[in-house]
Amino acid sequence: MAKEIAKSLLDIEAVTLSPNDLYTWSSGIKSPIYCDNRVTLGYPLVRGAIRDGLINLIKEHFPEVEVISGTATAGIPHAAFIAEKLKLPMNYVRSSNKSHGKQNQIEGAKSEGKKVVVIEDLISTGGSSVTAVEALKLAGAEVLGVVAIFTYGLKKADDTFSNIQLPFYTLSDYSELIEVAENEGKISSEDIQTLVEWRDNLA
């Protein structure tokens, strides 16, 4: 599954690699990889495979789940697809409270006393996941864990989740993706070294 998802992300250019002309993330980090999983929404077969893959992760690791929660904004549609398929309540978590109305940070199904799984599109450092998890816990939820489409495999993410003692699982990761990219002829063996060094240095 990991390689199939990685291939799909590369094929539809949801993930692009540029070892010699780095992208700049919003955080200012210079990176040879850019991931925009919102692109998957335009490809029904890909988004369906992602939905089913994430459902399999949930059934395997969190079978007692009662509420599906998406992180705003990119996690929301995938959470909706999953909740619909599983016939479960759903909500989503903003990065901060609204500045108007009821000033809610969580919209949708009530979380209090419920076992919740958080849906992310991408895990880089794990920061946005922690924000969502903390908001849900504050609302009285029992957060079981996080599932996501893709992770860069950074040590910082492992440390972040370890610090809050919460498991996370992804459909594919950076190592799988660059291996698939090399096999597909999208990058050279020299590029592989550059990509691995970037990840290790950033970690």
Swiss-Prot record:
Q: What is its EC number?
A: 2.4.2.10
Q: Which SUPFAM superfamilies match?
A: PRTase-like
Matching Gene3D superfamilies, A to Z?
A: 3.40.50.2020
Among InterPro entries, the record links this protein to: OPRT (IPR023031), Or_phspho_trans_dom (IPR004467), PRibTrfase_dom (IPR000836), PRTase-like (IPR029057)
Pathway membership: Pyrimidine metabolism; UMP biosynthesis via de novo pathway; UMP from orotate: step 1/2
| PROSITE patterns attached to this UniProt entry | PUR_PYR_PR_TRANSFER
Q: Which keywords does the record carry?
A: Glycosyltransferase, Magnesium, Pyrimidine biosynthesis, Transferase
Query: Which Pfam families has this protein been placed in?
Result: Pribosyltran
* Binding-site residues for orotate, renumbered to this chain: 124
Cofactors named for this entry: Mg(2+)
Molecular-function GO terms, alphabetical: magnesium ion binding; orotate phosphoribosyltransferase activity
Q: Which CDD domains match?
A: PRTases_typeI
Domain of life, per lineage: Bacteria
Q: Kindly list the positions annotated as binding 5-phospho-alpha-D-ribose 1-diphosphate.
A: 94, 98, 100, 120-128
Reactions performed catalytically: orotidine 5'-phosphate + diphosphate = orotate + 5-phospho-alpha-D-ribose 1-diphosphate
One GO term (biological process)? pyrimidine nucleobase biosynthetic process
The task this protein performs is described as: Catalyzes the transfer of a ribosyl phosphate group from 5-phosphoribose 1-diphosphate to orotate, leading to the formation of orotidine monophosphate (OMP).
Record family assignment: Belongs to the purine/pyrimidine phosphoribosyltransferase family. PyrE subfamily.
State how it assembles. Homodimer.
Name of the protein: Orotate phosphoribosyltransferase
- This protein's species is Staphylococcus aureus (strain MSSA476)
